[in-house]
Amino acid sequence: IDYIEAGNPYSNIKDAELFERLACIKLKHSRIASFGSTRKVGITAEKDPGLRVLKECSAETAVIFGKAWKLHIKEILGTTPEENLAIIRESIEYLCKNGKKVIFDAEHFFDGYKADKEYAIKVIRTAHEAGAEYVVLCDTNGGSFPAEIYEIVSEITKETDVPIGIHTHDDSGMAVACGIAAVQAGAVHIQGTINGVGERCGNANLATMIANLQLKKGYQLIPEESMPTLTETARAIAEISNISTTGLPY
């Protein structure tokens, strides 16, 4: 696993303390990432309290989310599409110039793409040009099906040179299938959780997705000798979270 997103150090004391403890732990391969949002409307990135906490956090990588759907830009942010692009650009540039590696999550991307393809692509390009190493396309409400995910991600990877990631939810029971479709269409970064633990109906189950992609489709994601640890890890997480793995694949 390349990145472990450990929480939002700005949101609560427990997450902040977790990052303090993680600073003392050396991992063999994985990199710890913090999570937060782009700057608020009406203030600079330098003055945004959430971004300042991400800048000061021990994690070298910051994952930040921003808007990609004009409906939310107008109704939730209360700003213009142009200002939203500036918010994304300035937030990423601020973190990058302060030594952070940045992954940008394009929230509700697929809804935004269906509503306005050109603007959604502008969001992707803006984030990448500002310094984001990956731009993650988020099916935030879990309403997409694999065929449309494949079609849209294929178009994005053909039209841009941006390293694309995928983030899916299981509200339609399609999180793993949509994630696999995105990889087959050219996505190079997968977000998910062990056993699919997550809000509402859950996220893509990494244990299932990794096994399916590597064992069934031939992608090399983890060392062969690490494959048996997927089951061990899934059972350990199930015990900690008190969520049964009965009936889950592998």
Where are these regions (language model features)?
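Catalytic cores and adjacent flexible loops of soluble metabolic enzymes
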Residues: 1-250
